[in-house]
Amino acid sequence: MIPRPTPTESGTTTPGAPVTAESSTTVRIRPDVAALPAYVPGARPDAASPVEIAKLSSNELPFPPQDSVVEAITRAAAGANRYPEMTGETLTQALARRWGVEVEQVVVGNGSVALIQHLLDAVCQPGDEVVIPWRSFEAYPICVAVAGARAVRVPLTRDARHDVPAMLAAITPRTRVVMACTPNNPTGTILTAGELAELVAGVPRHVVVLVDEAYLDFVTDPEAGDALTLLAGAPNLVVSRTFSKAHALAGMRVGYLICEPGLAAAIRSVSTPFGVNLPAQAAAATALGQAQLARTAERSAAIAAERDRVVDALRTQGWEVPEAQGNFFWLGVGAETTALAEHFRTAGILVRPFAGEGVRVSIGTTSDNERALAAAAAWRAAH
């Protein structure tokens, strides 16, 4: 029988369960695909819940898209009988202007996860290795496995940060990509400018360095690194960013990579044609207007200030919270993770548990955050 993933208590999956009658397929699946863990999204509210639910499980912005962006989506949807630009030329040009790079260096796609998958597909062969920090974004090892490579997980430091020397030490002749996430999802910690420079400089030039900066807009630490500042001197560097977080466009699915033109062309060659739909392209391009960017910066600053307030309150309650620089915070409670997530759920708050490791809680509205703080205080009082 073909092994299939089975659910675990945390909602993640483990390989090894055989296909059952309920699987309904007699098709021979690639063994490595059959063994993949399923990506687990943040929990969604139950419409039948008797209490008001605060969804703090997916790192979404609590604000809707800006009015001008919604209007652009509506206008574009009226032309949905036509295909969009195949590689998002208009959006690509706008991004190149925004970041001061060449158009040929920009690749847009259906969210940053899809682009990370395309990058790995372009450079990895079966048996190759990809070095990743761990715990980090849940999709990384899945993308690596789909590309036929092997994820080499380098544990975070005790303060939930990337261990740059250990990541560099993990590089072997089979390494094709070294991945970093700053701020790191789910722990919220950053790579400083010095650490980022050390990482990029220490990776051989034939190995790709992928830096995922999905949450960069929320960073307030002046020591934080910015991968784009290293791009000119590092032809193997790829910077990943998204419109899902600060731009409030998670439902549109638009991300982009910036790298040297030859690698960008290779990534496009394995990407799905017309991969970003027409309304999504229009939304993202509009979000890059000067007025829209200014409003996004204001919103991001407000989220960061609220994050700092919440983290300070949690520490006052007695929680150990790592440096938080995204729009979320991390409670590394280990074996108590499942119980803490259930405690929050009972209080009407959906969070993202990682069984045996900790709970990630997104920053929501002030009201939602106050409810989360009250639930956290109640847990501390009982434990």
Regions found by a protein language model. Give the residues of each.
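Active-site pre-lysine segment of PLP-dependent enzymes
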Residues: 145, 162-173, 186-209, 213-246
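PLP-dependent aminotransferase class I/II
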Residues: 236-315, 319-322
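Conserved PLP-binding catalytic core of the aspartate aminotransferase-like
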Residues: 303-304, 308, 312-347, 363
